[in-house]
């Protein structure tokens, strides 16, 4: 059995992760999300019977604010857009990045099915930063430090080098 969460909402995904853990649901969960303005996408593979989970992708800053340590967006920037109040708030990204995140997921699923992944991992794909830069946003050190287009890191090592902003 597999659970796929492609809604891109970290709060819902954290709730889902905690629900799965607290109810001892042993299933592979794929969390899929896109970064703003096509600068990248991510897929986390988490099995509740393995060490480390979706919570490991988050940390708190000196003010106690939670943030995604794997984000390609430098911390402290608001990249969301709003149309018609808070019900119309969204993160802008193009259709092509959704195709990339779908392929990233399918490749990770294939490796998982073939037994080639033995621990919980985060797979990240760098996208084109043209529109992101044009909009005046700053990329995180994570984006800058990732040399390859696609990176796969065990969640056990996710905090190594990922706490930089």
Ranges and model annotations:
Residues 2:
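Short, Asp-centered acidic motifs that coordinate Mg2+ and/or phosphate
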Residues 6-165:
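Glycine-rich phosphate/adenylate-binding loop
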């Amino acid at each position: 059995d597999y659970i796929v969460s492609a809604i891109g909402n970290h709060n819902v995904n954290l709730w889902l992760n905690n629900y799965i853990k607290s109810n001892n649901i042993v299933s592979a969960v794929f969390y899929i999300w896109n970064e703003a303005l096509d600068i990248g996408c991510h897929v986390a593979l988490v099995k509740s019977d393995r060490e480390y989970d979706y919570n490991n992708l988050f940390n708190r800053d000196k003010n106690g604010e939670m943030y995604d340590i794997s984000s390609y967006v430098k911390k402290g920037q608001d990249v969301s857009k709003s149309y018609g109040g808070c019900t119309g708030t969204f993160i802008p990204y193009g259709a092509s990045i959704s195709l990339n995140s779908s392929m990233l997921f399918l490749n990770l699923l294939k490796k998982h099915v073939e037994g080639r992944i033995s621990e919980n991992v985060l797979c990240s794909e760098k996208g084109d930063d043209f529109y992101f830069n044009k909009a005046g946003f700053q990329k995180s050190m994570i984006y800058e430090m990732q040399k390859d287009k696609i990176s796969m890191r065990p969640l056990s090592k996710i905090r190594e080098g990922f706490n930089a902003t």
